Amino acid sequence: MPPPSDIVKVAIEWPGANAQLLEIDQKRPLASIIKEVCDGWSLPNPEYYTLRYADGPQLYITEQTRSDIKNGTILQLAISPSRAARQLMERTQSSNMETRLDAMKELAKLSADVTFATEFINMDGIIVLTRLVESGTKLLSHYSEMLAFTLTAFLELMDHGIVSWDMVSITFIKQIAGYVSQPMVDVSILQRSLAILESMVLNSQSLYQKIAEEITVGQLISHLQVSNQEIQTYAIALINALFLKAPEDKRQDMANAFAQKHLRSIILNHVIRGNRPIKTEMAHQLYVLQVLTFNLLEERMMTKMDPNDQAQRDIIFELRRIAFDAESDPSNAPGSGTEKRKAMYTKDYKMLGFTNHINPAMDFTQTPPGMLALDNMLYLAKVHQDTYIRIVLENSSREDKHECPFGRSAIELTKMLCEILQVGELPNEGRNDYHPMFFTHDRAFEELFGICIQLLNKTWKEMRATAEDFNKVMQVVREQITRALPSKPNSLDQFKSKLRSLSYSEILRLRQSERMSQDDFQSPPIVELREKIQPEILELIKQQRLNRLCEGSSFRKIGNRRRQERFWYCRLALNHKVLHYGDLDDNPQGEVTFESLQEKTPVADIKAIVTGKDCPHMKEKSALKQNKEVLELAFSILYDPDETLNFIAPNKYEYCIWIDGLSALLGKDMSSELTKSDLDTLLSMEMKLRLLDLENIQIPEAPPPIPKEPSSYDFVYHYG
């Protein structure tokens, strides 16, 4: 007979003694269990002790976390967190450097435990650590190693969010900033210093001001030219944090400073085009920098043109002058009157494609795109003058009904690009889709506009469009751009080539192909056949998911970015009635046997499956402090009485497999993206196989009519 669910069998170790094999009743108070363990070894004062895990990060066990103890777990009897904190507090201030170094090593390890961290912080432990850093006594032996452990402990303690970052002194900030600015500083010290500064900036506006005064752009950029991608990532993360928290009136100054120090080209050459693959966290930081850079355009995008502002009107005059040359300026003509000049201006503004021919300034009063559209037009006219003049003159010489209005097109195109690139929106925590081509030019948005306005003009000609077709052309251009961007061209020239291949005829072909594929499967007979086949396909997918669960998968345990990963394995019994699981020393290369998995949970006890932020192990820390992909890969099984089994899938595929399989076990619909994809693929294949004999045969919308009954049934023969 299996033991009750409240009883867990564990081994408890104590240095110099034989391990105790104990059955722990989870309903008993933890203090009572600790007393029983101490009595087994004749240890006095059981209140001085506690239990913690023997493996991994060796976390302390509390009344709140004791439910995580599983059968077969090896525990240690250890001194209580309060005593450990007190002893480490004394040892970290010892005059013996070896003692102090050992204490710092242990402190850096224990600080990841929130139970210990709370005790240590309550003893003003953070103040002690900051003073040790502030003293900066470099003459001490093991200085670099000791400092690295001190900064690690400080960062771990602050990560728990128990105390505010505002308690940090200006002296401490100067000291940490000094490690970032010093040449040839130890890599581990530099990494932790960058991480501490980033956390300070993100968590405190007042600290942002102080750090911005201490750290220069040049100091951070120098760390991007190293070969260590982790240091590069932390440096860009700090740059992004400073950029994000800077007041709006300071952001443009920061961008100018970055441009002067060639930040973009350094990132391009040393990070994007480096010899190492871009890791997920680096890709996210590059995406954030890309978004923050484009967000500098928001002010101009939301600024309306003032029709009475002469400086702004002069820009429109400049556009006209460049397009039609100063020689044609009516003000230069002898005896030119005001009315004649106005008529000439109106004619020119019409040829420039403005909607309001008399006062084109009114075209820029809509936001978005506001003044940003005028900025783009002026950039094109001055930097790519030949292209600008060609587009304007080419359209002004066409028949009226086929001319592409440059002014209106430029305004709508600018608005479209702002929508596609989401100018003005904050970075998304879960995204990492940066575009390398935007790091190849200091004026990437303006260059992108220049490429796309030529695309628009080309597409207009290919469509033989008229003014009535303007919106249709813009829809095609949007489709061309959005189809080209996912290929992530490495340069603007590659992007231009990709757009060239997506001509109007190619877009029509793609649309037709997609529409035909869709239409083929929308006729009533096909829909009826599809509905008949779908349950069979879903059952096939369900069996595949359950078979994968029976094979099992390895999962990593939740951990801090500075801790070594630990793994556990879970697989479904062949009769689909029990989940077997257990801890592993390493990530397994093959299948793990049922016999080696000590724990099990009956499927009948499962109450629900939760995902993402609803998971208990995701609520311990905020999403900002988690790895960017963890939330999307997390799920938990809630089972009787009030237990949880927490998972972090190794990838999105395994996540979908397990969510589908567990849903199928509970009799629920499989709703993952993978199921939808598999269903579409398998249904499409099955439908095509069944319809092979009907190739080139028109399938009628309705079944053929039933013929009338014959006048007699004399043709019927009855077999005797």
Swiss-Prot record:
Domain PH as annotated: residue spans:
553-674
A Gene Ontology molecular-function term? SH3 domain binding
Q: Which GO terms describe its biological process?
A: actin filament organization; apoptotic process; cell chemotaxis; phagocytosis
* Major subcellular site: cytoplasm
Subcellular location per UniProt equals: Cytoplasm; Cytoplasm, Cytosol; Membrane
- Kindly list the positions at which Phosphoserine occurs in this protein: S503
| Modified sites of kind Phosphotyrosine | Y48, Y717
Entry's Gene Ontology cellular component terms: cytosol; membrane
Q: Which PROSITE patterns match?
A: ELMO (PS51335)
The UniProt entry, under InterPro entries, shows: ARM-like, ARM-type_fold, ELMO_ARM, ELMO_dom, ELMO_domain-containing, PH-like_dom_sf, PH_domain
Residue ranges for motif SH3-binding? 700-707
- ELMO domain location is 310-484
List keywords of the entry alphabetically. Answer: Apoptosis, Cytoplasm, Membrane, Phagocytosis, Phosphoprotein, SH3-binding
Q: Which CDD domains match?
A: PH_ELMO1_CED-12
Q: How does it assemble?
A: Interacts directly with the SH3-domain of DOCK1 via its SH3-binding site. Probably forms a heterotrimeric complex with DOCK1 and RAC1. Interacts with ARHGEF16, DOCK4 and EPHA2; mediates activation of RAC1 by EPHA2. Interacts with ADGRB3. Interacts with AUTS2; the interaction is direct.
Function recorded in the entry: Involved in cytoskeletal rearrangements required for phagocytosis of apoptotic cells and cell motility. Acts in association with DOCK1 and CRK. Was initially proposed to be required in complex with DOCK1 to activate Rac Rho small GTPases. May enhance the guanine nucleotide exchange factor (GEF) activity of DOCK1.
Under what name is this protein listed?
A: Engulfment and cell motility protein 2
